[in-house]
Amino acid sequence: MAVISKKIPAPDKVEIKTALISVFDKTGIVDLARALSARGVRLLSTGGTFKAITAAGLAVTDVSEITGFPEIMDGRVKTLHPTVHGGLLAIRDDSEHQDAMKQHGIEGIDLAVINLYPFEEVRAAGGDYPTTVENIDIGGPAMIRASAKNHAYVTTLTDPADYAELLEQLSADDGKTAYTFRQRMAAKAYARTAAYDAMISNWFAETLSIDTPRHRVIGGALKEEMRYGENPHQKAAFYVTGEKRPGVSTAALLQGKQLSYNNINDTDAAYELVAEFLPEKAPACAIIKHANPCGVATGSSLVEAYRRALACDSVSAFGGIIALNQTLDAETAEEIVKLFTEVIIAPDVTEEAKAIVARKPNLRLLSAGGLPDPRAVGLTAKTVSGGLLVQSRDNGMVEDLELKVVTRRAPTAQELDDMKFAFKVGKHVKSNAVVYAKDGQTAGIGAGQMSRVDSARIAALKAEEAAKALGLAVPMTHGSAVASEAFLPFADGLLSMIAAGATAVIQPGGSMRDQEVIDAANEHGVAMVFTGMRHFRH
């Protein structure tokens, strides 16, 4: 395959003589322009940026003056001109490039300060199709890519956070920038345009219902660097995609240390689970460890929901993540701070609750500003060696399914409620998952086992341990409903559930041996329904 090859010398220091400034986000731009002007840098600009700099009383040249071509088509075409791009792309030490610049009257541009139309914000705000398309920047990305490619000679700034470092360099090096700085800024510039284009391409795919586009790019903006990843020897950072889905990426940290990699992963799992329970129907609480629930419950009040969730497995809850579907109040906060907890996340927090949690300064408190919609469409992604697995979010809701009673005995109204509750929780448990529930409370959770029978047994064992801790005569699995997130392949799993005391079973169905499982349920007088929807989770 033929490739383009050209060796370009990279001088260490390059003096900034001419700067092109064209920004939508004008944060700090006047101060930057003033500092550059004070150093004798010639300023070129466009549109609204030109007006802002002129209004500050600074000398600035409109790009149309150097191109000899006016802005046209509502500003769609203003910098897409050889005079601009030649000034950005010219190799200063190449005699042919120098000759071309002289021949065509092109002036070298040493600094490009560019940021883009707010496509991400318009998309997140639900802008209509024409408005969203109109906010796709064309000239900005073109200039960023051109200047960043020529970073041997040109400095590219795409983030107002970098203005101060530029000015420090100019002060320290007599108006010059170092190659290492230009190189870093170029890398940042290409990352910015890549993320921008990824957002646009994904928006088109979603809007046009293109499930498997020929190319898929998932972009994000760095929110924070982390001390380490899942383990101390792993490096990690948290990126946000711009999706305005209430949760750990959008929540405000009201107190406590920076969230760790594991905190973020677990908090996301906890909040997505608790959002399955509508706050207007009942308060709900989910307690998570290692991305698996160890207790979930509803209650007549938020504090009751917390107490009931904790009762399922108070040992595993130590050092866990607590997610609530309603505003954290003082009474609930008083209960939570009695136990060592890593993170609390809720839609909102009362001032009284904040004061109570403040007694535990290391306890991280997050206010998410709302609950994620469990029915909303979206994507999930997972890296594999040399690839990326992308799928639509599991937004199936048991309330939307047509449940099929497959046994002679139909479930009672209470059993049906508990079935739905258990199936909701099971959707958020690592497979193989078995969840016992009774009266809006998990009685036992079995997660992540290679055998579904083992998950059923572990869940029953957890219920027995909870019964002993609570002084109950029998475990709560007695008279409970039980959910399996995938079909029961054999009757042995069902028999384990019956042995634990379950009287009703909810599962997707679809096994070759469904009839064998149904027959076993009928033999023991157990009610069973099929959902027709599986919830594998890996």
UniProtKB/Swiss-Prot annotation:
A GO molecular-function annotation: IMP cyclohydrolase activity
One GO-annotated biological process of the protein: 'de novo' IMP biosynthetic process
Pathway involvement of the protein, from the record: Purine metabolism; IMP biosynthesis via de novo pathway; 5-formamido-1-(5-phospho-D-ribosyl)imidazole-4-carboxamide from 5-amino-1-(5-phospho-D-ribosyl)imidazole-4-carboxamide (10-formyl THF route): step 1/1; Purine metabolism; IMP biosynthesis via de novo pathway; IMP from 5-formamido-1-(5-phospho-D-ribosyl)imidazole-4-carboxamide: step 1/1
Ranges where the MGS-like domain occurs: 8-158
Keywords: Hydrolase, Multifunctional enzyme, Purine biosynthesis, Transferase
One GO cellular component, as annotated: cytosol
EC numbers, comma separated: 2.1.2.3, 3.5.4.10
Keyword Ion transport: no
Pfam family, one: MGS
Reaction it catalyzes: (6R)-10-formyltetrahydrofolate + 5-amino-1-(5-phospho-beta-D-ribosyl)imidazole-4-carboxamide = 5-formamido-1-(5-phospho-D-ribosyl)imidazole-4-carboxamide + (6S)-5,6,7,8-tetrahydrofolate; IMP + H2O = 5-formamido-1-(5-phospho-D-ribosyl)imidazole-4-carboxamide
InterPro entries linked to this entry: AICAR_Tfase_dup_dom_sf, Cytidine_deaminase-like, MGS-like_dom, MGS-like_dom_sf, PurH-like
Keyword Transferase: yes
HAMAP family the record matches: PurH
Family indicated by similarity: Belongs to the PurH family.
Domains (record comment): The IMP cyclohydrolase activity resides in the N-terminal region.
Protein name listed in UniProt: Bifunctional purine biosynthesis protein PurH
Organism, as annotated: Rhizobium johnstonii (strain DSM 114642 / LMG 32736 / 3841) (Rhizobium leguminosarum bv. viciae)
Gene: purH
